[in-house]
Amino acid sequence: RTVCPNNEIITDNAGKPSVMVYTPKFTMKEMIAGGSDRVHPAFVVNGVERDGFYISKYQNTEIDGRGYSLPAEIPRNCVGFDLSRSKCTAKGRGWHLTTIQEWGAIALWCKKNGHLPYGNNDYGKDKRENMYRAIRVSNVETGKGRVLTGTGPLSWSHDHTVAGIW
């Protein structure tokens, strides 16, 4: 909890934690000038309007065949859709892959609030920020620039704070 004081720690059916960021419900007009009073589709699940949703703070790492959102871990990569989905649903009720609607809501929020998150696009750093680097997974991975989850600068977070989505 010390590393992520403004986030939620949610456990799965195996009792293992994931760090999650809560996104409260908003309407289209709150994000887009001239938008409608409709609630953004990310907040409507099976026809039921929700107050918000949780999204993984970090790219997931794999523990015991399941995905977990944890800081300073090696992110799982090269996983196909079906395997990714099974790793999420194995965690129990309510766990799912992030939907296109949820990513859309996050993108609209970022645009509205003037935040364009940076990220690892140059072997552990962002090409736009030469001074900042994340912690590389391994310096011996020739040609690979993967970094430990959440170790980049604040500009890599969706809201540019420690509480954001990395």
Where are these regions (language model features)?
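Short aromatic-cysteine micro-motif
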Residues: 38-166
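N-terminal module-boundary/linker segments of secreted carbohydrate-active enzymes
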Residues: 1-42
